[in-house]
Amino acid sequence: MRTEYCGQLRLSHVGQQVTLCGWVNRRRDLGSLIFIDMRDREGIVQVFFDPDRADALKLASELRNEFCIQVTGTVRARDEKNVNADMATGEIEVLASDLTIINRADSLPLDSNHVNTEEARLKYRYLDLRRPEMAQRLKTRAKITSLVRRFMDDHGFLDIETPMLTKATPEGARDYLVPSRVHKGKFYALPQSPQLFKQLLMMSGFDRYYQIVKCFRDEDLRADRQPEFTQIDVETSFMTAPQVREVMEALVRHLWQEVKGVDLGDFPIMTFAEAERRYGSDKPDLRNPMELVDVADLLKSVEFAVFAGPANDPKGRVAALRVPGGASLSRKQIDDYGNFIKIYGAKGLAYIKVTERAKGLEGINSPVAKFLNAEIVEAILDRTAAQDGDMIFFGADNKKVVADALGALRLKVGKDLNLTDEAKWAPLWVIDFPMFEDDGEGGLTAMHHPFTSPKDLTAAELKAAPENAVANAYDMVINGYEVGGGSVRIHSGDMQQTVFGILGINEQEQREKFGFLLDALKYGTPPHAGLAFGLDRLTMLLTGTDNIRDVIAFPKTTAAACLMTEAPSFANPAALAELGIDVVKKAENN
């Protein structure tokens, strides 16, 4: 039906007769002439109808936005004064000789100026996806997956599919369950990841595996989370953690080079402990120059319990955050920041405004100045490298609250004061995570997942002091987003059972949930390691949007609903009966 795409016409096509298929993006009726911007997947081109082709001109008068049409015409160069530098096709236009209206469009539920609520965009997603910026994002996503496949093929990885209907295993979030008709009362789980299957593939001798795969997690959603999401899943045998990171870093550098024309360079490596200490986060945004600085040793003897208490507590921390130029912040702005950090458990926000450093105590403005002598103030200013016009914020509490609160404040202030270099790319690896973290109920939970290997520990050493164990795990972070994470896996049955035991999984439960894995570990399991990237998040970064729903064709809302299809929906009672399921209705309040 077509000979060319609208968005691909250039000066090289001048004089050629072309047939185009697409939609009316905009129509301008000048009486004797009608112009339309005609759109398809590749872009927009201007088409005009003149009186010399009366039939086509008459039919063109009926055109409205989003009519689906076919146009045949001749490509012409625009007059120099009419060239549109903002359009890829802006040097040419098409003089139409024939027009076919393939399908008309009703009045549109979306605003033609594209000022629409997200609810409307999701309900009429098929119209929203016609917008050039949305089409471009999905084309970029397709390019990314194509580049990934070629790279992985070139590096000896095999694309192997793993099951969608599998067994529920504890991986940190709730499972989506699928009832079995054949085995009434039993359920499959949709996979949160192919974790165990890819490990079993390594035990099967496939050496290098990858898969671009859907995963499912029934969890409370945030702006950058979806109940179903896509992973670039990778596993290798006989490779160390640095070797895995080297290959995966090469993949990501390749993507940025091909999609953005950007050389990311070598990725720095930072331990979890250093990231938390310097940036208050295990996914630091290195485009932001501000760092947290420990000052507890300077404040142990001050007569101000807010500082002295945490400074003398082994589990406490007092840290400072210097904000370049922050002395210009108003009292209201400071109060707003104080309220902001309360979200993260902080009780308040102490600060020092540095107006004239050379004057010592007289050169600062601070509500806590009365508790500090000149020597302490000078030491704080030295350690934070404060200059005239700077602001120093303080966090004083337990270590987690200080890291969370000042880490979040660092990001917010960086954006508010334009201190974060938005034009920069800042990738890094974060390694050496704690193996376990407190579950809040006196026990331990795996920081990554229970199949992660500890670093340089025997099973006996791990069992003796699990709270001090470091995991052989690594995350890739770009501009403050965790885009991928992985680890060296446990390849010893004894070690795996030890980890299960530390997590409070007794032997009976181990057999019930992981018997197949424990059995497989008995038969010559190779050392193996892997990683998974979030394709949605990678695409989000590479397309420059901050909304993950912009890079998924048919996403869910934050309530895990599809507004277009109205999923989830009630099931047919007959289908439920066949599955042996009764739906219990909530009692209405009297």
Swiss-Prot record:
GO CC annotation terms, alphabetical: cytoplasm
Residues reported to bind L-aspartate: 171, 217, 448, 489
CDD domains assigned to the protein according to its UniProt record, in alphabetical order: AspRS_core, EcAspRS_like_N
GO molecular function annotation: aspartate-tRNA ligase activity; ATP binding; nucleic acid binding
Domain of life per record: Bacteria
Signal peptide region: none
Name of one Pfam family that matches: GAD
Record's keyword annotation contains Metal-binding: no
Chief localisation class: cytoplasm
Known role: Catalyzes the attachment of L-aspartate to tRNA(Asp) in a two-step reaction: L-aspartate is first activated by ATP to form Asp-AMP and then transferred to the acceptor end of tRNA(Asp).
Protein name (database record): Aspartate--tRNA ligase
Species of origin: Citrobacter koseri (strain ATCC BAA-895 / CDC 4225-83 / SGSC4696)
